[in-house]
């Protein structure tokens, strides 16, 4: 197996590590992407979360949030789709269509169908001052999309898998509507693999805190759990990219779901010192002074390419 190292230097403070696997191994480090982070919209079957994304004001506010890192991830997702330009593409949990935009730019005669259950998010995307070419929207549930089998050449879901109450049903449904040989790309934040009981307890605590806002279906995945999910559904997995973005700054502004991560930090610091130390080791450190908090660490995202067997 070959190994290649790339270094690409830029500006600002953040950096990204890309560990790719495709019949070989490639490591690249890109410095200077900054530390603005933002998650895309995803589904959650709890009442509160669904209500938020069905609210027009919240949907519009969500659509305004973006970052260099999120844009970078969207481009990498588009790369992994390996488009020729004439594909029929399903964008599952499309939200306002932000990730569909860079994908659409690579199409010539193809089109993207974006499906979401939150009508307010779809409306905001539809009203955008710069409409996405060859992009069509429709309402629907992720685990029961309103399309015939073998309808799409490509499919993707971004920043949403951790919100699905039935992720196995979702990836199986995508397999149904994909044509033989079609690609399904999953982009999602990932947490560290649990190596011992402390890691397991920390993972439980993290999910508990996030569920207060995002509902009972919320669950962070690990790289191996997403790989197992796709493999069990019947996909062949030719490529997995793990990308880690670092931050070193005052406050949690721009860090994805940073407020919730800080809640985790504050609670484990008070209740479980052992978990606090593990959080610092696996994710980030935090130091308070006066009314400010300095945070330093990194969060990871996974890009997974699943192919429907011929």
What is each stretch, according to the model?
Residues 156:
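A conserved beta-strand element that flanks and buttresses the S-adenosyl-L-methionine
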Residues 168-183:
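A short glycine-rich, Lys/Arg-flanked "PGG" loop and its adjoining helix->strand segment in the class I
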Residues 218-233:
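Short alpha-helix
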Residues 257-258, 299-310:
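Core SAM-dependent methyltransferase catalytic element
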């Amino acid at each position: 197996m070959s190994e290649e190292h790339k270094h690409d230097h830029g500006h600002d403070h953040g950096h990204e590590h890309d560990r790719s696997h495709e019949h070989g191994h490639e490591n690249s480090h890109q410095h200077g992407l900054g530390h603005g982070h933002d998650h895309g919209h995803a589904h959650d079957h709890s009442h509160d979360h669904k209500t938020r994304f069905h609210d027009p004001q919240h949907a519009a506010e969500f659509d305004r949030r973006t970052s260099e890192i999120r844009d970078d991830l969207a481009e990498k997702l588009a790369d992994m789709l390996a488009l020729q330009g004439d594909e029929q593409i399903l964008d599952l949990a499309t939200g306002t269509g932000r990730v569909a935009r860079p994908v659409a730019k690579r199409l010539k005669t193809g089109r993207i169908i974006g499906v979401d259950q939150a009508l307010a998010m779809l409306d905001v995307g539809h009203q955008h001052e710069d409409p996405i070419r060859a992009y069509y929207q429709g309402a629907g549930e992720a685990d029961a999309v309103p399309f015939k089998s073998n309808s799409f050449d490509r499919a993707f879901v971004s920043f949403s898998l951790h919100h699905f109450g039935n992720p196995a049903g979702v990836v199986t449904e995508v397999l149904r509507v994909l044509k033989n040989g079609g690609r399904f790309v999953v982009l999602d934040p990932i947490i560290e693999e649990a190596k011992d009981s402390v890691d397991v307890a920390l993972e439980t605590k993290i999910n508990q805190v996030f569920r207060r806002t995002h509902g009972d279906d919320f669950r962070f995945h690990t790289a191996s759990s997403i790989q197992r999910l796709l493999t069990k559904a019947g996909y062949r997995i030719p490529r997995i990219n793990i990308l880690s973005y670092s931050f070193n700054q005052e406050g949690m502004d721009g860090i994805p779901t940073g407020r919730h991560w800080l809640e985790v930090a504050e609670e484990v610091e008070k209740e479980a010192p052992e978990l606090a130390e593990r959080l610092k080791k696996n994710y980030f450190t935090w130091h308070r002074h006066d009314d400010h908090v300095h945070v330093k660490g990194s969060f990871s995202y996974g890009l997974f390419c699943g192919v429907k067997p011929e």
